UniProtKB/Swiss-Prot annotation:
Keywords: Repressor, Ribonucleoprotein, Ribosomal protein, RNA-binding, rRNA-binding, Translation regulation, tRNA-binding
Assembly description: Part of the 50S ribosomal subunit.
Family: Belongs to the universal ribosomal protein uL1 family.
Pfam families in alphabetical order: Ribosomal_L1 (PF00687)
UniProt source species: Ligilactobacillus salivarius (strain UCC118)
PANTHER family: 54S RIBOSOMAL PROTEIN L1, MITOCHONDRIAL, LARGE RIBOSOMAL SUBUNIT PROTEIN UL1M
Record-given protein name: Large ribosomal subunit protein uL1
Gene name tied to this protein: rplA
MF term (GO), any: tRNA binding
Amino acid sequence: MAKKKSKKYLEAAKQVEEGKLYNASEAFGLVKKIDFANFDATIEVAFNLNVDTKQADQQLRGAMVLPNGTGKDQTVVVFAKGAKAQEAKDAGADVVGDDDLVARIQDGWLDFDVAIATPDMMAQVGRLGRVLGPKGLMPNPKTGTVTMDVTKAVTDAKSGQVTYRTDRDGNVHVPLGKVSFTEEALEGNFKAVYDVIAKARPASVKGVYIKHVSVASTFGPSVTLDTTAL
């Protein structure tokens, strides 16, 4: 049974012209205008792609740093030992550890946003797969979070890095910033994300690749973008 929409949502939805494709500037202005959350909500972009995620070469996954940040202070943990652990601390990681950090997470601590690991720690970190995997927190080479360059990884995470991956239906959701951002900042972040997704087109995809793009705030209705204008 479909969840009943709130009165505030329905009022906001009335301001979105049905069937209209908005340019990016119009879309972000409207999303900001119709947001009704009593906090600084996140604005997210959703892509629907013409990909078959059953094919390994058509699964998108990666990371990028948004030019205007995310508006969120990221709590970063690093699994590392010795000199690499010190490097992570110097780079600004919030929590650094090895077996002790693995044990802490096994005991239920998950108060962080990004997890980074050096390759030599992945045997231990792998034991956390069932905990970190479903939350999208498992370190992965494709997102730059399994690396010996922990300084860059921590700096990127603290500077507004976002990750992206296709779900089984070919959708990709990426946060672009907060409602408090200017339209220009949101549009700049969106264009950066759009370029990355467009360039990640698998060679085996035929026909139209990006089928649908929309933006919305946390609780607000979505606004569809005109991809021909991008």
